[in-house]
Amino acid sequence: MEEVCSICLEVLVDKEAFTEPCLHYYHNECIKEWTKRANTCPKCRRDYSQIRIGEEVISVKNRSLELHLVDETLEETRERLISYTNLCALCEDPSTSLIYCESCGGSFHFNCIGIGDELDSEWCCPLCGMFQNHLGEASNRNLISATPVGEGRRRVTSIVNTRRTNSIYRSHSNRPAQRAHLMTDSDYTMIVDQHREKLLESQLQESNTQSSGEEESWKLLDEALKSGTQNSQSSEFSTENNVVPLKNTHELGRKLKKPRRASGIKKNVVERSSSHQSTQILKPSSSLISDLLLETRGNSRHPSFTNSTQKLTVEALQSHDPTLKLNIPKTETLSLDQKIVIQKLFIKPRLRNLYDSNTLSKDNYIEINKIICRRLYDKFLQDQLALAYLKQVLEVKERLHGHDLKQFLAQFTHWSELNDFTDDKWQKQETEGSCNHKQTQILSMFDSIIDTMLQNELHKLLT
């Protein structure tokens, strides 16, 4: 087996350089660089005094540091290794039958360190590596405290605890919040009086800020609430055939609102009544009045007396009564399949030709496609014959190719090719997709519209 250099882990070809006295071989450059930093052998960690490279002998300076340790420091380091609980340091199982180390104070089971029950056998501590004889068992912490290690532990522990207590006291006594126990009763009384004066001053300032105008506004609001409550109670006893005109409804809503100028109220009532009185007669409901009263009471603590108040209009009544909502027609939109037919048969062939001829870039292609598609969708929605044509194309697709619309449309490059379309499955001419004369005229007109749109967009790009 080839020997390798322990420094660079490469194969040793020429064994020329070695250390003395351990006689371990290395590369010349490797051992020289190693010697600049340490004089211990990389393999066995023994100190060497010189190295031999062939016939050359190089002396090595001792680079080990001399350590001057204090006994108290050693005892404190030793203290950290002492087991403070009756636990085995290897299996961490509590037991009263333990053996302890004289050097580090670690506790172990007899079976864990492999000495059995022989009292005169030697054993090695797994923690500190100290060889020692079996001296006895450590059943509790009192046995450890009887040794020199226990005495040193007590001395170091007392010093550390004293220093820790003093530092904690100093850190807490320097904080203002921790000096509260040093204050007298007179100090507490002075602090309470200062806070009471500040609270009284703030309350006086808030009470002075309330003006006389606000007091009058509050009074008017209370009167409006009282009148609204009376009207709501009287409406509960009214019959179902009682019909209230729109003008009276506005007057009832005006009583529930905040005070405003009379001129603005009259003008608003005339405009609202003239626009809606001739069209419909509204019937007030008790739920509407109760909702408005609850809404007014909820905002009564912080009212804002402005002219932009919510009025009792037809729209407000419709939001409470679903039977009064107007039937607003929904705007018709194209389906996804119809949009695909328009793109594949009308727009894509033209844009594809421009893109293949390098007239349009990729970004321009996408942008123009969006613009033309949106405009053409609106054109198709406005013409019923064009919509009928789209439905006919989708019916042919469903009969012949099921749900694969793109595969069906990939066979054509223009909408006119559907007129001559034949299928082997049907073995006959399909007339559902063919256009009549009016549809052909409309779709041809769409072709001219698309060409005009393309010319305009290309002109914008060039300019």
Swiss-Prot record:
Q: Where would one find the signal peptide in this protein? A: none
- What's the name of the protein? Autophagy-related protein 36
**Top-rank taxon:** Eukaryota
Q: Which gene encodes it?
A: ATG35
Classification via InterPro entries: PHRF1/Atg35, Rubredoxin_Fe_BS, Zinc_finger_PHD-type_CS, Znf_FYVE_PHD, Znf_PHD, Znf_PHD-finger, Znf_RING, Znf_RING/FYVE/PHD
Pfam families named in the record: PHD, zf-RING_2
Region Disordered: what ranges? 229-281
What GO molecular function terms would the record report?
zinc ion binding
On whether Zinc is a keyword of this UniProt record, the answer is yes
What is the annotated role of this protein in its UniProt record? Micropexophagy-specific protein required for efficient micropexophagic apparatus (MIPA) formation but not for general autophagy.
> Could you describe the subunit structure of this protein?
Interacts with ATG28.
- Write out the transmembrane intervals: none
SUPFAM superfamilies hit by this protein = FYVE/PHD zinc finger (SSF57903), RING/U-box (SSF57850)
GO biological process terms on file: autophagy
Induction and repression of expression:
Expression is induced by methanol and glucose.
> Which spans does this entry mark as compositional bias, Basic residues?
255-264
Q: Which residues form a coiled coil?
A: none
Compositionally biased tracts (Polar residues): 229-242
Q: Where are the zinc fingers (PHD-type)?
A: 85-131
Q: Keywords of this protein's UniProt record, alphabetized?
A: Autophagy, Metal-binding, Zinc, Zinc-finger
Q: Does the record's keyword annotation contain Transmembrane? A: no
What is the native source organism of this protein?
Answer: Komagataella phaffii (strain GS115 / ATCC 20864) (Yeast)
